[in-house]
Amino acid sequence: MALFSVLSNALSELPVSIWLAAAATFAVYHAIRAVYLIFFSPLAIFPGSPWAALGEYWEAYWNIGVRPGHKGQTLFKLEQMHKRLGPALRMGPNEVHIYDPAFYHELYRPGSRYYKDPSMHKVLGAPTSTLAESDPVRHKQRKAPLEPLFSKKNILSLENMLMEHVDHCCQRFDELYSQGKPVSMEWALKSLAMDMVSQFAFGQSLNAIADPEFKSLPVRVFQQYLPSLHVIKAFPFVRLLSSLPLWIARRISHSVEMGHELEQFAARRIDEYIEAAAQGKTPNFPTVMERLLIPIPEKGYEVPDKQGLRDEILTLISAGDDTTGIANTVTLFNIIHNRTIHDRLLAELKTVMPTPTSHAQYIQLEQLPYLTAVIKEGLRYSSPAASRTPRLVPPGGVRLPDGRFIPAGTRVGMAIYHIHYNEGLFENPHEFDPERWLQGPEITAKRAKFLVPFSRGSRSCLGINLAYMEMYMAIAYIVRRFDLELVGTTPEDMKWDDMVVPQFHGEFRALTKRRVD
């Protein structure tokens, strides 16, 4: 306190002229910087908002808000601007956003020289995870224990475990129907995804489905934390507050509080797993934690420290909970809302599940053409990881087809949503239409090239096989077992804001009556 008092007194005794000079210097510096960035920067050739050229202000303006439709709008604003101004826009002082589908496979192809920007994950969290690793050699080493685990062969071995969670979910639907209560489908399907991915991660599920309203703490925390990343990206100093004790963080920032909750949740689960493993208590199927704790010297993999393990688990559960839950939510709503789609899908499901209590193997479900078309359309339409995923332009820069040059080190990105809703690739993109995936092998293959919900290349989502199995099983069994009736939910409720993952404007509620035939 004495030091603070001395500094305060010293500053107060400075002449007014010095303060005025400092203020003038500050103003002149930022004025010169603004003129340079807007008119003379190498990126000044790209159109866009002048505010975007100066910093995060433009993006923050469109993304940070409270009311539905007044937050998370950058994604949609970019779409409008691209249609007016062309395929490349100024997105920041050192960032260009691209809207050209052909460039997507250059940017995200296997062996791409466009590396991840490490500064992004330092701000957004989990900086020591495999997901955040920007160096391709280290990234390959970090993936070594996980790639075999997420292979289709290994994921197929999880079918019985996943089926137990589907059965538990259906049991909860029965309980609520017997009480005359509708199911909040978004929360239920996110809880189902949470139980599946947490058991795969730790060998023991979080039992989120058992929560009376499907709003267990882990599901709520992830639901509330991800949208706060817009605030953290715009104001990185908020991330620094995470070092404060939780009781202080609660009083300062809800975003920081949620971040604390997530870190403590992951740390507890890791400690519990390590303690159980030391006592010889391990599950009878391979888990993520088990593989992460085994070094692979020949592939350069070393066991991460506690922070590294925590970051891996947080990214795994975040990627496997919200995204799959959202894809299932959007898909199921559109099945119920469109009776033609519903009836055709139900008829096909009856060919492998003659009664509502029948079971079908996952490999049987995969072979159903209309179910497969519904799943693909659900992934396109929901675009659960919709936002742009920036990369850094490699040494030498890149010249776009129109001749404009982007210097090396520039951040450049594209959004999955803009691919999935591109009218040149998908006719009537705002219509949920499974038929677009049943128009012959040549057309379907062309469209499949641009179905990229899991991204592409060496940095694509490891969990693709798990996500597909979860979706096939959840959609097939819920539709076959229940005659679902919407309760007040309309397409307006299913509109969404891009809060890192889609955040719906309303609630998807349905009565879950068991079928008798």
UniProtKB/Swiss-Prot annotation:
What does UniProt give as the signal peptide span? 1-23
Q: Which UniProt keywords apply?
A: Glycoprotein, Heme, Iron, Metal-binding, Monooxygenase, Oxidoreductase, Signal
For this protein, the record's Pfam families field holds: p450
Q: What molecular functions are annotated in GO for this chain?
A: heme binding; iron ion binding; monooxygenase activity; oxidoreductase activity, acting on paired donors, with incorporation or reduction of molecular oxygen
Q: What is this protein called?
A: Cytochrome P450 monooxygenase yanH
Q: Which residues are glycosylated?
A: N338
Identify the species of origin.
Answer: Aspergillus niger (strain ATCC 1015 / CBS 113.46 / FGSC A1144 / LSHB Ac4 / NCTC 3858a / NRRL 328 / USDA 3528.7)
**Native organism taxonomy:** Eukaryota, Fungi, Dikarya, Ascomycota, Pezizomycotina
From the UniProt record, list the coiled-coil ranges: none
UniProt pathway annotation:
Secondary metabolite biosynthesis; terpenoid biosynthesis
